[in-house]
A protein has these predicted regions:
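Catalytic core of soluble alpha/beta enzymes
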Residues: 3-142, 169-178
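Oxidoreductase and adenylate-handling cofactor-binding alpha/beta cores
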Residues: 148-154
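Short helix/strand-capping turn motifs
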Residues: 154-159, 163
Length: 179
């Protein structure tokens, strides 16, 4: 599960702890801060939510401030994943070279398709960064492409491919079934 945050960061730790209490220890729990924290808020959140045993924290700081992302990554015990900070191959290189994140979230629709995503994932692999393939709100056909891409890359260990769920008028609805 991946609860989303971004507004009212002072309340996020309590919400994450409530989710953990509701689902128990058997469920992996991640948190997407949606660029909503400054460094101090992020550090307070990590300490307050420590007992929730989060697996990953996604994009805790604003995309416009990559150095903040690096400071948070260096200061906390949890893997920090860049999402909004990764749009181009140059972003991947900057994140990897600067040690600004532990992981990257590659979204095919955001980065410009499979060819660009392959290069980004290769940069991440060379730098020792794990990858997740994520998605935007997109049709099931795009999700199927993301899944095929994720399964074809050796350093993609996570997928968050639910952007088609609840999409109204999806012309490719039913094109794939996950079991």
């Amino acid at each position: 599960l991946k609860p989303k945050g971004g507004k009212a960061p002072s309340r996020h730790a309590g919400r994450v702890l409530a989710v953990r209490a509701a689902v128990g220890e058997a469920v992996e729990l991640r948190f997407d801060a949606n660029q909503g924290f400054n460094v101090e808020q992020r550090l307070r959140f990590v300490e307050a939510a420590r007992s929730a045993k989060l697996e990953i924290v996604e994009q805790p700081t604003p995309r416009s401030e990559p150095d903040l992302l690096g400071r948070v990554t260096a200061a906390v015990h949890l893997p920090i994943m860049a999402d909004e900070s990764l749009v181009t191959l140059r972003d991947a290189y900057r994140l990897a070279r600067g040690g600004l994140a532990d992981m990257v979230n590659v979204k095919l629709m955001k980065v410009g398709g499979i060819a660009e995503a392959r290069q980004i994932v290769a940069v991440a692999r060379a730098a020792g960064l794990e990858c997740m393939v994520g998605c935007m709100d997109e049709a099931a056909l795009g999700i199927a492409g993301g899944l095929a891409f994720a399964l074809s890359r050796p350093n993609v260990h996570y997928a968050d491919l639910d952007g088609h769920v609840g999409l109204q008028g999806d012309p490719s609805a039913g094109c794939m079934t996950l079991k």
